[in-house]
Amino acid sequence: MAIALLAPLTRGADLPADRRRGWQELSLVSPAQAQQAFTTALAADPADRESRLGAALAWLQQRARTPENVAAAGRLLEALRRENDGDDAGIGAAYYLARIAQVHSFTPDRAAALAGYRELLADHPGHPYAQLAAPKLALLLLYDDVPPDEWERRVAEIQALIPRLTAPEALRDTRLTLAMALIRLRQDHARAYPLLASCLGAGTVKRMPRLNTVLVQAAESARILGKESEAAAYYANFLGEFPQDAKSDEIRRRLSRLETKGHP
């Protein structure tokens, strides 16, 4: 299970040794060792809120997801948020409580997750954990069975959120989530294409298989919209990045047709 590890790792030299070791073990997906390190850190300083946050995440990272482990994490996170909802640990706790409601709980609560993400973005918009919440919020809002007018209101909410995002990864993921929902659920290439193009233009889509998928989708959307030179550029980019991909032969044919059409 992926865990987003943020603030405690950015001040490595200043961290107490056991707390630092705990976060390092979490980053290596070693929850038992992380829990041991955080227990030692808390024995030395029971008020260490970042070690308490780490201990909660170690429960969530256990390979065996059980109601007991999720409940243990939830209790630690609730206490952190209740004591102080404005420091790094309290804001992190709010984020992970929303994640529990969305994906970790054995009885997921979409409404609680939505409320948690919205509250983070409203109260702490520039905080890294709030930025992480943005694409999660988009996913929950857009992939829900709601009437068309409500779905459009949700699209508008995400569109209004995008200019407030400052973390490149959060901006990329939120744009891509919206773009793919527009295509998959509405076949709305006109609104989706600028989102795809902006991500590719910013150079923030780098890893396979995401780059593979986004290049093909941007090319297809551009082609459908009659932007043939842009479609050809994306197809050519794809072939340069992934010459041996299983789709390469078909992409070459599509590129050839566009080039032939442009040069009769």
Predicted regions and their residues:
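Short solvent-exposed coil/turn linkers within tandem alpha-helical repeat scaffolds
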Residues: A41-S51, L80-I91, F106-T107, L121-L132, ...
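Residue-level recognition of tetratricopeptide repeat
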Residues: W23, L57, Q61, R99-Q102, ...
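Structural motif corresponding to the intra-repeat A-B loop/turn of tetratricopeptide repeats
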Residues: L28, Q62, P67, H104-T107, ...
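N-terminal leader/linker segments that initiate helical-solenoid repeat arrays
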Residues: A2, L6-A64, E68-A71, D88, ...
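TPR/TPR-like (Sel1-like) alpha-helical repeat modules
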Residues: L114-D123, P135-A138, E228-A246, R253-S256
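TPR repeat positional signature
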Residues: D18, R52, A56-W59, A94-L97, ...
